[in-house]
Amino acid sequence: MEAFSYVLILTLALVTLFFAVAFRDPPKYDK
């Protein structure tokens, strides 16, 4: 189960970084 824990932690870290960048810098692209 260690692999699952590592994947979960890495996913949470990536999501946190993504939201930090998204909220710090408004997206420049339009849908």
Curated annotation (Swiss-Prot):
Protein name: Photosystem II reaction center protein T
A GO-annotated cellular component: photosystem II reaction center
Keywords associated with the record: Membrane, Photosynthesis, Photosystem II, Thylakoid, Transmembrane, Transmembrane helix
Compartments it resides in: Cellular thylakoid membrane
Described purpose of this protein according to its UniProt entry: Found at the monomer-monomer interface of the photosystem II (PS II) dimer, plays a role in assembly and dimerization of PSII. PSII is a light-driven water plastoquinone oxidoreductase, using light energy to abstract electrons from H(2)O, generating a proton gradient subsequently used for ATP formation.
Subunit structure: PSII is composed of 1 copy each of membrane proteins PsbA, PsbB, PsbC, PsbD, PsbE, PsbF, PsbH, PsbI, PsbJ, PsbK, PsbL, PsbM, PsbT, PsbX, PsbY, Psb30/Ycf12, peripheral proteins PsbO, CyanoQ (PsbQ), PsbU, PsbV and a large number of cofactors. It forms dimeric complexes.
InterPro entries the record matches: PSII_PsbT, PSII_PsbT_sf
NCBIfam families linked: PRK11875.1 (NF008825)
Highest rank taxon of the organism: Bacteria
Family: Belongs to the PsbT family.
Pfam families xrefs: PsbT (PF01405)
Chief location bin: membrane
Keyword GTP-binding: no
GO BP: photosynthesis
Membrane topology field: Single-pass membrane protein
Transmembrane segments: 3-23
Native source species: Prochlorococcus marinus (strain NATL2A)
